[in-house]
Amino acid sequence: LKTDSRKVQSGDAFIALAGARTPAEHYMDQAISAGATAILLESEQERQCHERHGALIVPVVGLRARLGRIADRFFEHPSRHLRVIGVTGTNGKTSVTQYISQLLRETGTPCGLLGTLGYGMPGSIESATHTTPDVVQVNRVLNRIRNEGGRAAVMEVSSHALDQGRVDNLTMTGAVFTNLTRDHLDYHGSMEAYGEAKARLFLREELHFSVINFDDPFGRQLYGQLEGQCDRVRYSLHEAQTELWLKEFTPTASGFRARVDGQWGEFDLAVPLLGSFNASNVLAALATVLTLGVPVERAVSIVRELSPPPGRLERFTGSTGKHVVVDYAHTPDALANALEALRPHIRGRLICVFGCGGDRDPGKRPEMAKEAEKRADYVIVTDDNPRTEQPCSCASCPPVSSGT
């Protein structure tokens, strides 16, 4: 079952949906040429099934809205056979997803991944095209995870995915909220609409528990909204009355030491990750696996071995002893967090090299410039995937100048 006509092989069934500027019939003809034997065709009105060049054409009214049910049934309900955890938030999704997966795997639960860094089980990860793929591909990957021995799957769930139905009809065990800061306003139009999209992940009837960052204003709002819906677990860097909170934090050259308290008791952590925001990410992952029943002592021992995802405060050291840290930070909040995170770990100058993507929200460019100027000793502005914009415009020289 395919949704991309370029990937159709002989004998496949193809789902033909209209694109932004391209009718569904165009993709249908491509799929038939590639050997598709059946086509589910998006249709505005009821029509009879018919054949076209040897392929069965099945017109379906409201096909896009039915994709979740179709994919779930086609792949024999894979999410029902796994503990599926969805992670959403502006920042931290990739790190939290990776940490949950590492903790589950090392404590005896084979766990797959879906997110920015790829889809599948460790050792057979396929490249990602989206943070959250379409609902057919989500079910295909979950089915592969199940067939390869997985018992759990942790997935990044973007606001686009929630708005576009890419996780419809999945059976989810838990959901994690990291934070909500400015991003994707070119798509959602307002922070209110952006927050509403995120909240959909937590309003699912089948959800057993939610893990919520109680330091985030929207997280507090979400926590209140979910009263009586599912078990709620709060984590915090400051609030002592939450289920898991950071009592002490000490930066070290290679990471940090922490003392944590809450409903699972008080315990110490040694974490090989940079930054206080990674303390928040680790708390989110710990709260999730402890809620799933992993023993505290076992989880604490595995935290010592956590490794950051590629491009998430990833440290490189050359022969001169100088440190270079690469981070994915692509929002003002994420850039501020990354720069602040590094300060306690360094003695010399902090030089920031950043850029903004072309054809994306231009409003955040001067805001990112302000954060860089405020927190770094020296700032270099470049472009970051200009897309259709001119590189100099994409580097946002005039907007960045106005921001600083």
Q: Can you name each region flagged by the protein language model?
A:
Residues L1-R69, P217, W245-E248, L274, ...:
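N-terminal leader/targeting and accessory segments in enzymes
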Residues A13, A38, L56, G174, ...:
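Well-ordered beta-strand positions
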Residues G19-T22, P308-G311, D333-A336, E340-G403:
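Active-site beta-alpha connecting loops in nucleotide-dependent enzymes
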Residues M28, S101, L142, K198, ...:
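Generic hydrophobic/aromatic pocket-lining and core-packing "Φ" positions
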Residues S43-E46, T116-L117, S159, L180, ...:
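Short, ordered loop/turn segments at secondary-structure junctions
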Residues Q45-H50, E148, D163, M172-V324, ...:
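Acidic, Mg2+-coordinating active-site environments of NTP-dependent enzymes
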Residues L67-F214, F218-D231, L283, H345-I346:
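Phosphate-binding loop of NTP-binding sites
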